[in-house]
Every structure is written in C-alpha cells, then in structure tokens.
C-alpha cells in the first residue's frame, strides 16, 4: 500500500490501527485493507494469504481464488507470494461517486476443505479532481440603479473529490465594484454571490469582466475558474423576491407523472410589465433534473414528469429563477431541496454458486453444497433480506456472513428413496408488503453401493420331471438391486457344495447374467428325489454386496421303469417256472404266485396281473389275482384237461403309458400218487449243487455273524451316547431339519435309502418309518423334538436281531430252489370312498406256531432288498423282524395298511409255487389201509400246509 505521508506520525498511528484491525478481523472471517485510488498496476495492498493463515504452498492445490460481485478485475492475488495487488486503474469517483465510504468487497474461496473469507478493501480518495464551474463564461445583467450591497447569486463550482479535497474557497480579481460573498447554511450548501460595492455607471463602464477562481483543500491544491461577463442595465430597479430562499420537500419514489412537488412564489414591487414574473429553472440545471421535473412558468408549480428512483438518486437540488418583464428584466433565485422517500420497489437478488454437485448419498452432515449471496437495492428495512429453503428436505441454509448463506447437508441422503432434489431458495425483504425472489438449485444424489441384491423370496420350490434333457431350463432366479448403474448390475452363481459323492455343479448350473438355472444332466427320481442348493446374487459395486436364495428342486417320478419279475433260481426251462398240480385239487386252489417289483413310485409302481388267453382261444382252468399275482384254479380239474398248461401272466403298472413284463408258468397236471415222486426227485436234484456250496456258506455265515456282532456293539454304544447327550436339532445333521414332503402319489414310505436322499446335510440317516400326509407342505418341518417324535419312529422300535433259531431248514432251501418266492402286491378294497390301494409291507405266516415267513414288501417305490425267515419249530408265535401291527392308519391318507392274517383252514399257501413234499408221501404210507376218500381229504389238507417243509 502506498502512502505519501509516511513521515507523518499521525499517519503512522493510523496505519498501525488499520493493521491491528485487519489482524483482528481474520478470526471473524473478514479482512480490511485500504488502497489509494489511481494506484499504479502492481501496487501492494496486503499479504492476504498470510493474514488468512494459509500457507503459500497450499494456495494452488486448494484452488485459491478471488471472486467479487462487481469490478472483479481491479484487484488480484499473486499465488506465488500470496500478495494482494492492484490489477487495474481504480477511480474512486467512478466506483462510489460522492459516497463518504467506498470499499471493494472480495470473496476469497479455497477448497479442500471449502472455506470462504470476506475481504474489504477501502479505496481512499486523493485530490485528483479540480473544481469545475458549470459554465466557463457567465453572463450577468445588473441594472445601474442597483444599490451598493446588492447581492447577485452565482452558481458555485463542484469538486468530485470528498472530504478536505472537496472543500472549496473562492477568489475574485481585484475590482472596485464587486466582491464575492460565500455563505454556508445548515445543509452545508455554499451560496456564492456577487456583491455590489459601489454604484454602477453604465455610461462610464457598460461592461465588466471578472475572473472567479475556486481552490480546493487538497495537497497540492487544484483550481478552477469561470469568467463573469457583467452587462450594466438601466431602469427596472426592483427585482422579484421569493417567499423563501430554500424550500424543503419530500417525495415518494416512483411517483406518477404529474404529481405536484412544490409551488414556489415570488413577488415584485414594481408595477405594470415590470411586475409580471416568469418562473424558470436556472440555466445551470443538469439535464437529469430537467428530464424528471416540470416547472410551470406562470404559477411556479414543480411537478413530476419522469421516473423518480430512490436507488438512482436519494435527493435533488433544484434552482428556480423568477424574472420580471421589465427592461431590463430583474430576477431572483431560490433553491428547492427535494428528498426522495424510499419505497419497497426492488425485489431481492440471489446469486447461487454450486460447488459440490452431485452429492454422494453417504456424504457427512454439514457438507457444503452451494454458496448463496443476496442483495436488495432498497434501503433500511426494505433492504434487509432473509433467506429460506424448501421445507422437508435434507438440507438447510446457514448464514456465514451478512447477506451470505451456505447450503449444507442437514440429514442423511438415500438415493434409492430420492435421487434428486429441486430446492427453491426464497429471499424476502423486510418491507411492507414484502417482496421476494426465488432461485432453484438442482441437487443430484450420486449413488454408492449400499444395497445388496434382494430376492423376492427367501426360498423357491421347483418341480422337475425326471429324465429331462441335458441343459434343460428348470427355473429362473431374479434379484433386484435398489442401487444404480454398476452398483445394480447383478450376477448369479452357485454356492458350491457336495451332493453325495459329486459336486453340485455337475447337476445344475446358473447363467451369470439372466439367472436361469439349467439341469446339466438328466435327473433320476429313483436316485435323487430332492436337490437343495443355494444361488448367490452379487452386484458389481466396490465393495460388492450379495445375498443367497435357496432352491428346492423336487424330481417328479415318471414311469420309466418296467415291472421286474423276481424269478426262481431253479425249476423251469428258459426262464419259465414249472409247477406240478394234482388233478384232484378243487376250485380256488393256489397253484403259484408271480411276484414283481417296480422301481418307480406311486401309481407308476402299482402293479396288476393279468392272465393272457391261451392259444387257439382254448379256455384254461386257471386265473390270476388282479393285485396278488396268485395263480389259482377256477374249477375242479378233471381228466379232460390238458396235462400241460403254459400260462402267460402279464404284469403291468398304472403309469401313463403303462409298462409291462411277462412271466411264464408251466403247470403240469399229475395224478395224486405221482406228485410226491416228482417233488422228491426235484428236491434230490437240488441237493447236488447245494452241497457244493456248503463251504462257501460256512464262510458267509461266519462273516455275517462278525458283522452282526459289530453292528450290535455300535448300536449299543450309539444308544448310550444318545441317552447321555443333549437333544440335537435334527436327524440329518447338526442344525439341519428333516425334510418331510408330500408326494402327489403315495402317502408313506419305509426305506433307508429314501430317507437318506431327502436329507440335505451330510449326516448319517436313520432307518425310520416315516408317515407322510398330503396336507404337509413340501418344505422342511420344524426342528422341534416333540414334532419329530410324532413323525419318526423311535430307535427303540427298530427290529431286534433275528433269533438264532431262525435259520434256513433243508426243506425251506429246497422250496426256495424249486419255486419263486413272491409276495402279494396289494389288495384292492372297495370302501365308501372308492377303491383304496393297500400297500402291504410284511405278510404274516400261517397262524400255526410252527410255520411262518416274512416276504419283502411290494408296492410303491419298494426295491428288492428283502429277506425271508422261518420260525423254529420250538418257538412260540411272535412278530418277526420288521413286522408291523395288523392294521394302522396314516393320518391324512385314505390308505389303511394292514397285514392280512389268513384263516386257519385257508387253502392259500404263502409259498411262491405249490409243490408236494415228502411229508405227504409218508402219511400216505402210514394210512395205506384207509379208503380212497379219506386219502384224498388228507392230500388236500397237506397241500395247504406243505410249505412248513420248505
């Protein structure tokens, strides 16, 4: 900053005060500097960076910049040394006019973090303007009759400077007739007048030329001059006189045209023409006043004829002259001081500078979004402006300085709820009525990855038919991410795990983009009934977010397995079964039983038996049970019947379409006396190869006993641990519930293999009897221990190890070699609700204590893992391993599972095919003396119980 009065002690004190004031203002956010007008380019103003507490090295990185509402190029900051200097010519008179205070307001903005500083630079006046008179030559007419002491008003000079630089003094050339008179009134208005010192004599000197000099109070002094050309007139010796020298008037701005301002009045003591007065504006009046006001020359009324704006000019000084019509004319002057009263006619102005757009939705609170400055050209209360913001938005306005606001974040943002805000900033002044202005700010919320992909369900259930083609589309998963752009791009993948011995990815795959799930290979219901796995959805954000969904794929059964016949090991030719039947049997005698199994489930495994008609349409005396497979006689046999019958039994399931198998049974009709011999020969022929296997059977028995002993020890240890351990959550593994699902067909199963397949965990399954109700949903059941006890049969209900007396007898082995061990497949009962399919699980033996057998269950989904045993002759009647009660009802299913107890006198044998053993031959020898009738009755009775030797 330049000072020409550096040596002055008072100036040094003033400078020190200014520096202390500037230092104190740094803490409050505003600095004060001063600079003289007309300073040269590069003139030092202040060390702004140092005063603001900023390091020079951070000016450029923090984007140090200076902003100003007006005259932004007058001052500039050197970013290398942080000095504020003069950039262009500063003219105080052009910048502030005749205002007593003149300052340049600057805004200094730095980023990272955003800070705003306010700097006020005071522009000091220098004496650079000389006094100026309105006219270079002033013509003045003075009558020679004017008396000494008469005063003639003159227009004084004006100086554009202020303060002492504008204080003017006047001087007049030396003359004996005139002197200058300068008066100062209460309004600090200097009245310049020319006073006549002695009488004029027009005849001596008709004209006088005077030079008036105006000198200002600056250093150095500047002067201005004007020349007075005085013409001496004769006659009219009374000039008009105004009632008041000064008129003070107040006028509202924006007054309409024609509004009366004031009426001036002057009187003249002369008479006649010399008394007539005409009013006019002084010839020195500015063009601006002449354009805004009108003066009636006759009545002296001043009225408005232009726009009166307080913001343009707060007051007007109007010079009015009254001139009579004498010769020469005489005049008088008065001054009208017009004060303009401000009204609230200017709306506030808003300037918004956006700094941080768009705004991240995770931005911290109090983040500065934009800077807002307001102004109002009105004064007083009319110029006091307050700002407000649209309600119910997560932003607020914070006043940082007078008429300056910051738009800051007030509450957390969520782009998924609102992606953009249209804010309206309202600036309202304090006038009555108040005026306001609005400005819109569009705030866009930028997305961050704060939402994970979400599935519409936590679990999906899918039904797929088995034998699907490889690559078959079975389902489509879809997850939605509430984020935008890359944060919403979802990719899908499998959550890999093991399914038995194979990886999950060998069964199914999922398309990464579409979420389509494909079966990579044909699924087999008999191998896998339920495939449970998880699909993961993950977005492309940083860091990525994800979620999982569970898919339960139920493999529905198709009729893809034909019935399989359980054929005997010996007897028959080319796979056919041979049976010998005495001709003496009556109607209903069971000749043989055909047994078959189907690997499918439900109706696809429900088997029925049909006897194909004989060749040539001949009627045969045999029939087959529709659901039992038992071949029995339809009538008593006689001599006319052919000795050999080839029976074709068609076994078919109830699938769509049904699959079939054919069993061939060769029935030979023999006389009653020949049947025991044939049976004996067959038994003798079977013992030959059986003897060759004795050694092998010994090893097998030893191995079976060892394995059984190990199994018993394991079960005992497991039972002891389970009784002492706390209850677990489920049977399929820790934390994994047993999955109980209802099938569309069938309502129960008894299968160790099936129980293992529906478990999604890796734990060992139990061999339980599980009853399924169609009302059960196809989803995992509760892990509650009480509910599990209602579904699973307790381990204590498992069958015990077979009694050591349960062994294969020689007759039983012979019977097994000579016949097909089959079991009834079911009994169709007609009830009130229609026929019910009964799936027997274990068949009871004859009620006698010395005979009994258990055959493998045949029905829906039952495999051929079955066994047969015989009660020892000395044991009482008891339930064998795996036998069920006579009848039990499965809740929710119409099926009634029963074990059919045959009557004592029933002729239906439980052996697969009827043979005549040695026991009948022995009885006939002992009763040789009896009649043929008694012998025939014995033969019939022995035929029904002969399976005890088998």
Curated annotation (Swiss-Prot):
Residues 30-133, 134-242, 243-350, 351-455, 456-565, 581-678 form the Cadherin domain. One of its GO terms (molecular function) is calcium ion binding. It comes from Homo sapiens. Residues 30-697 are extracellular. This is Protocadherin alpha-3. Residues 777-806, 831-856, 869-950 are annotated as: Disordered. Glycans are attached at residues 257, 265, 548. It comes from the Eukaryota. One of its GO terms (cellular component) is plasma membrane. CDD domains: Cadherin_repeat. Keywords: Calcium, Cell adhesion, Cell membrane, Glycoprotein, Membrane, Repeat, Signal, Transmembrane, Transmembrane helix. Residues 719-950 are cytoplasmic. PXXP repeats lie at residues 734-737, 774-777, 799-802, 832-835, 873-876, 891-894. Residues 782-797, 909-923 have a biased composition (Basic and acidic residues).
């Amino acid at each position: 900053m330049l000072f020409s009065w550096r040596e002055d002690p008072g100036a040094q004190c003033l400078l020190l005060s200014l520096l202390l004031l500037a230092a104190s203002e740094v803490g409050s956010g505003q600095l004060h500097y001063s600079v003289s007008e007309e300073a040269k380019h590069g003139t030092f103003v202040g060390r702004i960076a140092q005063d603001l507490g900023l390091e020079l090295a951070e000016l450029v990185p923090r984007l140090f910049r200076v902003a100003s509402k007006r005259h932004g190029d007058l001052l500039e900051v050197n970013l290398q040394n942080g000095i504020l200097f003069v950039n262009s010519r500063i003219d105080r008179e052009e910048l502030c006019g005749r205002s007593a205070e003149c300052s340049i307001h600057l805004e200094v903005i730095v980023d990272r973090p955003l800070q705003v500083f306010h700097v006020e630079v005071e522009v000091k006046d220098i004496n650079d303007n000389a006094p100026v008179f309105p006219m270079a030559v002033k013509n003045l007419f003075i009558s020679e009759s004017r008396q000494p002491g008469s005063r003639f008003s003159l227009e004084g000079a004006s100086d554009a400077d202020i303060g002492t630089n504008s204080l003017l003094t006047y001087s007049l050339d030396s003359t004996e007739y005139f002197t200058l008179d300068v008066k100062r009134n209460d309004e600090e208005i200097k009245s310049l007048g020319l006073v006549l010192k002695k009488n004029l004599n027009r005849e001596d000197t008709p004209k006088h030329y005077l030079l008036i000099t105006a000198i200002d109070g600056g250093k150095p002094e500047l002067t201005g001059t004007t020349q007075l050309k005085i013409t001496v007139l004769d006659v009219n010796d009374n000039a008009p006189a105004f009632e008041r020298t000064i008129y003070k008037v107040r006028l509202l701005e924006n007054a309409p045209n024609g509004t009366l301002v004031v009426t001036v009045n002057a009187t003249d003591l002369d008479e006649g023409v010399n008394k007539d007065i005409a009013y006019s504006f002084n010839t020195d009046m500015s063009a601006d006043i002449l354009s805004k006001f009108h003066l009636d020359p006759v009545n002296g009324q001043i009225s408005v004829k232009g726009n009166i704006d307080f913001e343009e000019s707060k007051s007007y000084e109007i010079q009015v002259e009254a001139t009579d019509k004498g010769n020469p004319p005489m005049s008088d002057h008065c001054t009208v001081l017009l004060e303009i009263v401000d009204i609230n006619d200017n709306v506030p102005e808003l300037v918004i500078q956006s700094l941080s757009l768009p705004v991240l939705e995770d931005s911290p609170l109090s983040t500065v979004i934009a800077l807002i400055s307001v102004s109002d050209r009105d004064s007083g209360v009319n110029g006091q402006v307050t700002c407000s913001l649209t309600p119910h938005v997560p932003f607020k306005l914070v006043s940082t300085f007078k008429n300056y606001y910051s738009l800051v974040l007030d509450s957390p943002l969520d782009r998924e709820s609102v992606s953009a805000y249209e804010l309206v900033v309202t600036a309202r002044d304090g006038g009555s009525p108040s005026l306001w202005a609005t400005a819109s700010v569009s705030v866009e919320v930028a997305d961050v990855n704060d939402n994970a992909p979400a599935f519409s369900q936590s679990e999906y259930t899918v039904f797929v038919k088995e034998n699907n083609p490889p690559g078959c589309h079975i389902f489509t998963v879809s997850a939605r991410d509430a984020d935008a752009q890359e944060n919403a791009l979802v990719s899908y993948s499998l959550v890999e795990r093991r399914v038995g011995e194979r990886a999950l990815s060998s069964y199914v795959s999922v398309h990464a983009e579409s979420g389509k799930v494909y079966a990579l290979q044909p699924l087999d219901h008999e191998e896998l009934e339920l495939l449970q796995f998880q699909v993961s959805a993950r977005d492309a954000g940083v860091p990525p977010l994800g979620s999982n969904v569970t898919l339960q794929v139920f493999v529905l059964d198709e009729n893809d397995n034909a019935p399989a016949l359980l054929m005997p090991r010996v007897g028959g030719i080319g796979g056919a079964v041979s049976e010998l039947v005495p001709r003496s049997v009556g109607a209903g005698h069971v000749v043989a039983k055909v047994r078959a199994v189907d690997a499918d489930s439900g109706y696809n495994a429900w088997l029925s038996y049909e006897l194909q008609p004989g060749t040539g349409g001949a009627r045969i005396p045999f029939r087959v049970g529709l659901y039992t497979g038992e071949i029995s006689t339809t009538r008593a046999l006689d001599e006319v019947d052919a000795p050999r019958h080839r029976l074709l039994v068609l076994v078919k399931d109830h699938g769509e379409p049904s699959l079939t198998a054919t069993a061939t049974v060769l029935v030979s009709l023999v006389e009653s006396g020949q049947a025991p011999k044939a049976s004996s020969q067959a038994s003798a022929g079977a013992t030959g190869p059986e003897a060759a296997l004795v050694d092998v059977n010994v090893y097998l028995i030893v191995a079976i006993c060892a394995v059984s002993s190990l199994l018993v020890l394991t079960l005992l240890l497991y039972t002891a641990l389970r009784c002492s351990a706390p209850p677990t959550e489920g049977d399929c593994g820790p934390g994994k519930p047993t999955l109980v699902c209802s099938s569309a067909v069938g309502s129960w199963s008894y299968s160790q293999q099936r129980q293992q397949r529906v478990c999604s965990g890796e734990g060992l399954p139990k061999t339980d009897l599980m009853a399924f109700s169609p009302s059960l949903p196809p989803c995992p059941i509760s892990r509650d221990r009480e509910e599990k006890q209602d579904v699973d049969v307790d381990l204590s209900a498992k069958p015990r190890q077979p009694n050591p007396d349960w062994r294969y007898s020689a007759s039983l082995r012979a019977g097994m070699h000579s016949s097909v061990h089959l079991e009834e497949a079911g009994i169709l009962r007609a009830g009130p609700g229609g026929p019910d399919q009964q799936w027997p699980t274990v068949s009871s033996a004859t009620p006698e204590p010395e005979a009994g057998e258990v055959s493998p269950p045949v029905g829906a989904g039952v495999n051929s893992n079955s066994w047969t045993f015989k009660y020892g002759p000395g044991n009482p009647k008891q339930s064998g391993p795996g036998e069920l009660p006579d009848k039990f009802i499965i809740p929710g299913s119409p099926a009634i599972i029963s074990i059919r107890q045959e009557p004592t006198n029933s002729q239906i044998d439980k052996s697969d095919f009827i043979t005549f053993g040695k026991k009948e031959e022995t009885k006939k020898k002992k009763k040789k003396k009896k009649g043929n009738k008694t012998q025939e009755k014995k033969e019939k009775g022995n035929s029904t119980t002969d399976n005890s030797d088998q």
